Design a protein with these regions (language model features):
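Glycine-centered beta-turn/loop sites at beta-strand termini
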Residues: 29-32, 38, 47, 55-58, ...
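Bacterial N-terminal signal peptides
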Residues: 10-18
Length: 154
């Protein structure tokens, strides 16, 4: 079935976007487990509750996980990734990303670019930065990779 341009198809907690690259899309998930994929343009994707998988694809995306054990992929562009309560995996990809974990034991990978990573939640998080000049604000108990150039413990 072909989906007309700029339409959102919702089927069993699966959202598929098809749009022109120059336009931004705003997508909200459900209280269930969602698989939300953005477009080549800038997107705002909010997974809400559930164990969600969010992927931005291109441009400068905002991905918000919400409660649950979420996986967020920024891909290309200068993205903003925000975890939430739960054990999240946050992957920035190429570009200078802003990544913030939430309550839970998160795994954060900045990827290529000058990333800003925040992981101050009082639980053990694992952080890797990748290429670029990265800044990390982390708890004293967090495991921070040696490839993170500037690390501040709080």
């Amino acid at each position: 079935m072909l989906v007309p341009m700029r339409r959102v198809l919702v089927l069993l907690s699966l959202v598929l976007l098809v749009a022109t690259p120059a336009l931004a899309d705003n997508v909200r998930g459900t209280r269930g487990n969602d698989n939300l994929v953005g477009t080549a343009g800038p997107d705002r994707i909010n997974g809400l509750a559930g164990d969600d998988r969010l992927q931005g694809l291109g441009r400068n995306d905002l991905l918000v996980g919400g409660p649950g054990n979420d996986t967020l992929f920024g891909d290309a562009g200068n993205d903003t990734l925000r975890g939430g309560p739960g054990d999240d995996t946050l992957l920035g990809g190429a570009g200078s990303d802003r990544i913030a974990g939430g309550a839970g034991r998160d795994t954060i990978v900045g990827g290529n670019g000058d990333d800003r990573i925040s992981a101050r939640d009082g639980e053990v998080d694992r952080i890797a930065c990748g290429k670029g000049r990265d800044q990390v604000v982390a708890d004293g108990i967090d495991v921070v990779s040696r490839d993170c150039e500037r690390v501040r413990r709080g």
